[in-house]
Each structure stands twice: as structure tokens, then as C-alpha cells.
Amino acid sequence: IGVGGLGDSQQAGYSLFELGMEIERLERTLEDRETQLEILGEIVLDREMESDLFVAGKPLKDGWIVSNFGQRPDPFTGKLAFHSGIDFTNGRPGSDINTVAAGVVVWSGPKSKYGLTVEVDHGKGFTTRYSHAEKLFVDVGEVVKKGQRIASVGSTGRSTGPHVHFEIYKNGRVVDPASYINRTDR
């Protein structure tokens, strides 16, 4: 013999009408919470994307600078010439060249004196160039993530040895990458 049970709605303290109203209120509350969670998720995603699009870092994880931006003796002629980027090496041909920010590949192929080159548009006026590669691993139109391998260190084009020539353009004008290598502030 069973004992207990739900009884009728009057014993529970709610009429069927009140119970229906309470269920509707809870459904609205649940919908509001779902909307709030979706908005919070979008905010977090936007912040992560903004962080990934932020141009900062160097294209070789364990590389060092062998030639800075600005005037320098041309390695082929010895005459003073403008160097439009920073050259990094790690002494190991074939090492990974990585993007310093997420973006869209706008060039992937040979480019006269630059040799095999990848260019990435990061939005907000920023484009980066990675040159003298041995191999390219991305195609034009491809979306790349921050830190993604896009090429390997080589010595193609006008080059004296394995390295990556790294340039940054802001609104179409080349800028010194040095101020972006250790950049942390937005």
C-alpha cells in the first residue's frame, strides 16, 4: 500500500491557473538568462578576437634580430640604404615563421627581391609581411590565427642567408616593427 503522493493542486498551495502563471514567469526568466549568456559569450568572443587581431610579437619564437629597420649598409653593395623591416634568424633553415596577429592572407607567393612572401591583413589599417621563406603554408584568402605557422625560414629573393624579413604597414605606410615586438598595451 502506497502512502503520500502529490495530492491535488489546492493542497500544494497553487491553483492550476497560478501554476500556469508561475511556469510562464519561469520560462521568461529562463529566456532572459539565455539572452544574457549569449550576449556575454559574444563579448568574450569579441575580446578574444580583438586580442588575436592585436599586432604584437615576433615571427620566430626562438629567433633574434640580425638587422634593424632604417638606414644600414646594403649587404650586397656596401652603400647606405633604407631597410624597411627587421630581419630575424635562429640559424635553422626550415623553422616555422608564425603570424604576429590573426587576419586574412592577401599575398602568398614570390615577390621580386623579397622571394617567397606572405602578407596578412589584420584590419584597422595593419598589414604584415614575412619574406625570404623557403616554403609557404597558406593561400590568399585564408584566415590565419595569431601564432599560426604560415611559412618556413629560407633565403629566397635578395638574401644573404636564412632569415625572415618582417615588415609592418600601418595605413599603407611601412613602420618600424621594433615598437610592436614587445607591445602589450592596446
Task: Please annotate each region the language model reported.
Residues 1-68:
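Non-catalytic extracellular/periplasmic "stalk"
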